[in-house]
C-alpha cells in the first residue's frame, strides 16, 4: 500500500470510530445502555486501529482486545480506559458472558462511564496520530 492508501484507510477507521461514539450517545438517550456500551468499545477499537495504521503503515491485526491493541500503539496513557471498555465487547451482547441479560444489566451510570472512557481514548488517538 502506498502512503496515500494508508492514510485513506486510517481515516476510514477513524471516521467510523467517531460515528460509533455518536451512535453510543444516541443509544443512551433512548435507554439502550448495553448497545451504547458495545458501541463505546467499537469506537475505541476503531480509533486504535486507525492509529495503528498511521504508526505502522500497515493494516491492523484482527481482534477485539483493546489492551493488546493499545499496547501495540503504546497507549499506556489510556490503559485504564482500555481496561474499562475491554469487557463490553462480549458482556454487552451475550447473556452467557454477562451471566444475566445484557439489556437489563446496564444502567445509564455504567454506560456514561463507558462514553467517558471512549472519549478519552479518542482524544488521545487524535492527539497522538494527528487525526482530524
Identify the meaning behind each predicted range.
Residues 1-132:
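Terminal alpha-helical segments
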Amino acid at each position: 500500500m502506498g502512503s496515500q492508501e494508508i492514510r485513506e484507510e486510517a481515516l476510514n477507521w477513524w471516521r467510523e470510530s467517531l460515528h460509533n461514539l455518536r451512535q453510543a450517545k444516541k443509544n443512551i438517550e433512548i435507554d439502550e445502555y448495553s448497545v451504547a456500551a458495545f458501541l463505546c468499545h467499537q469506537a475505541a477499537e476503531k480509533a486504535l486501529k486507525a492509529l495503528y495504521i498511521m504508526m505502522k503503515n500497515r493494516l491492523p491485526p484482527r481482534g477485539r482486545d483493546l489492551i493488546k491493541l493499545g499496547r501495540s500503539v503504546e497507549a499506556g496513557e489510556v490503559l485504564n480506559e482500555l481496561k474499562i471498555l475491554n469487557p463490553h465487547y462480549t458482556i454487552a451482547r451475550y447473556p452467557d458472558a454477562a451471566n444475566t441479560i445484557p439489556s437489563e444489566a446496564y444502567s445509564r451510570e455504567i454506560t456514561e462511564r463507558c462514553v467517558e472512557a471512549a472519549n478519552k481514548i479518542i482524544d488521545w488517538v487524535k492527539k497522538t496520530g494527528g487525526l482530524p
